[in-house]
Curated annotation (Swiss-Prot):
Bias kind Polar residues: ranges: 102-119
Known partners and oligomeric status: Interacts with 'Lys-48'-linked polyubiquitin chains via its UBA domain. Interacts with RPN10 and RPN13. Interacts with PEX2 and PEX12.
UniProt tissue specificity: Ubiquitous with a strong expression level in inflorescence.
Protein name stated in the entry: Ubiquitin domain-containing protein DSK2a
Residue runs in coiled coils: none
InterPro entries xref list: STI1_HS-bd, UBA, UBA-like_sf, Ubiquilin, Ubiquitin-like_dom, Ubiquitin-like_domsf
Length: 538
């Protein structure tokens, strides 16, 4: 055995510890000291001590091959200072784990028909500038439980009264998965044409988006209100110190011209959208400060300094995380954000699920199939559906669903059964329901396209209330908006340049196959690796 090891690796004797580099899918890299004759399983345990990925969820790839647990590192030709790529794999959760987690919670599960939804809330996005809403406010929950969410003003008050709720929502497996995958967030952010144009005009913002630590710190600040307040205090103190330094005022002026002013201009440069903030990624972040509406009362701004007088501004800077006083919102306003992130409410990572679809658009079953094949998506859905308390809070937000459950106790018991929810959300059941929904969409579109002058057309249109209600309830299947995301007109080679480089470093050299896998997984490197490895085994 020793001779064989010497013949395969002359410079390393059997049992001698060597350093092996491990590169994660989020770009981080670290070294692990191990023996080459050790098994892959023991090597994964060493990696788990240096990362947040458990050993049973690790997928190690070396030269395009996935390492099996019962094999040794030397059997794959691994040598000292070589690099092994690690991605997070999908592991089915045990049925006892969710029950144990539910039993450790101090709050008792509320009834489905209860009107008290303060523990969950439905406020505006924690990341309003990106359209990312893990709390399910606005249209984000339309793809999960239809429309009919509580008023956003009331939800904001609930958030203010219960700051721990934000922390609980950010601790969900869905949000944690996003925090551990900055590349996914960066790709979703860059899918927005306005955001991409802003980055092109301001390369400094591009450097921020290309730094995984900054994205991770931003998510951590949103998860921890105390940390966010501390960061805001430190920023104010730093700006005050910079202003007191020589040339500090000019430095702040340049920072305003290069950073803050482009962000303010981003709220007004929507020429085609007018004052509609739904297409603006920074409108909610800046509180519509750059949007002016005709007939607005300017008496509320009597203390604002005149820019032409040259007098310094003695008023405090506006709080981007606070509500804007006296702000008027258009009746048809929707949440600003990326189309691809519209379904992140509730299930926190459903990608295209819940995205606003054009009127009468027919959902695409192939997109649903691609989403259900995503291992991360399956894991997140299982974690959510296995928690009866979380499902009760979600269902209590929809008045129609709540009233229907009150009238049917048997249905309420079924919706509280985790096994039934898992079977109901299986890929086969979802595809069958999608087929039925497509037929309903076709019938609704044909009915709406009838000439009102024809005999019986008006009567048929007036009697479609039941069909509209049924289609609205189909939103509870998570298929309320499978119209496709706002894909930019950019070649996939440019869109997935970073992901293609990572796949090539892992040993996948077929560029065309890599592009097809990335297109099918919407740029998810982990899912693309799973897809490529599955195609190799076929």
């Amino acid at each position: 055995m020793g001779g064989e090891a010497d013949s395969r690796q002359p410079l390393t004797a059997e049992g001698v510890a060597v350093a092996v580099n491990v590169r994660c899918s989020n770009g981080t890299k670290f070294s692990v000291t191990t023996s080459l004759d050790s098994t892959v399983e023991s090597f994964k345990e060493l990696i788990a001590q240096n990362s947040d990925v458990p050993a049973n969820q690790q997928r190690l790839i070396y030269k395009g091959r996935i390492l099996k647990d019962d094999q040794t590192l030397l059997s794959y030709g691994l040598q000292a200072d070589h690099t092994v790529h690690m991605v997070r794999g999908f592991v089915p959760s045990s049925p006892s784990a969710p029950a144990a987690n539910a039993g450790n919670q101090t709050t008792a599960p509320q009834a489905v028909g209860s009107n008290d939804s303060s523990n969950l809330g439905g406020g505006e996005s924690l990341f309003p500038g990106l359209g990312f809403n893990p709390l399910g406010g606005g249209n984000a929950m339309a793809g999960l439980f239809g429309s009919g969410l509580p008023d956003l003003e009331q939800a904001q008050q609930q958030l203010a009264q219960n700051p721990n709720m934000i922390r609980e929502m950010m601790n969900t497996p869905a949000i944690q998965n996003l925090m551990n995958n900055p590349e996914f967030m960066r790709s979703m952010i860059m899918n927005n044409p306005q955001m991409r144009e802003l980055v092109d005009r301001n390369p400094e913002l591009g450097h921020v988006l290309n730094d995984p630590s900054i994205l991770r710190q931003t998510l951590e600040a949103a998860r921890n209100p105390e940390l966010m307040r501390e960061m805001m205090r430190n920023t104010d103190r730093a700006m005050s110190n910079i202003e007191s330094m020589p040339e500090g005022f000019n430095m702040l002026r340049r920072m305003y011209e290069n950073v803050q002013e482009p962000l303010m201009n981003a709220t007004t440069m929507s020429e085609n959208a007018g004052n509609n903030t739904s297409s603006n990624p920074f409108a909610a972040l800046l509180g519509n400060q750059g949007v002016t509406t005709q007939g607005s009362d300017t008496s509320n701004n009597i203390s604002a300094p005149n820019a032409e007088t040259g007098t310094p501004n003695a008023n405090p800077l506006p709080n981007p995380w606070g509500a804007t006083a006296g702000q008027t919102t258009a009746p048809g306003r929707t949440n600003a954000g990326l189309g691809g992130l519209g379904g992140l409410g509730g299930l926190g990572g459903l990608g295209m699920l819940g995205a606003d679809s054009p009127l009468g658009a027919t959902p695409d079953a192939s997109q649903l199939s691609q989403i259900l094949q995503n291992p991360a998506m399956s894991q997140m859905m299982q974690s959510v559906l296995s928690n009866p308390q979380y499902m009760n809070q979600l269902m209590s937000l929809n008045p129609q669903l709540r009233s229907m459950l009150d009238m049917n106790p048997q249905l309420r018991e079924m919706m509280q059964n985790p096994d039934f929810l898992r079977q109901f959300s299986s890929p086969e059941m979802m595809q069958q329901m999608m087929s039925l929904q497509q037929s309903l969409f076709s019938q609704n579109r044909n009915t709406a396209g009838q000439d009102p002058t024809q005999t019986g057309a008006a009567t048929g249109t007036a009697n479609n209330g039941g069909l509209d209600l049924l289609m609205n309830m189909f939103g509870s299947l998570g298929a309320g908006g499978l119209s496709g995301t706002n894909q930019p007109n950019v070649p996939p080679e440019e869109r997935f340049a970073t992901q293609l480089q990572q796949l090539q470093e892992m040993g996948f050299y077929d560029r065309a196959e890599n592009i097809r896998a990335l297109l099918a997984t919407n740029g998810n490197v982990n899912a693309a690796v799973e897809r490529l490895l599955g195609s190799i085994g076929q």
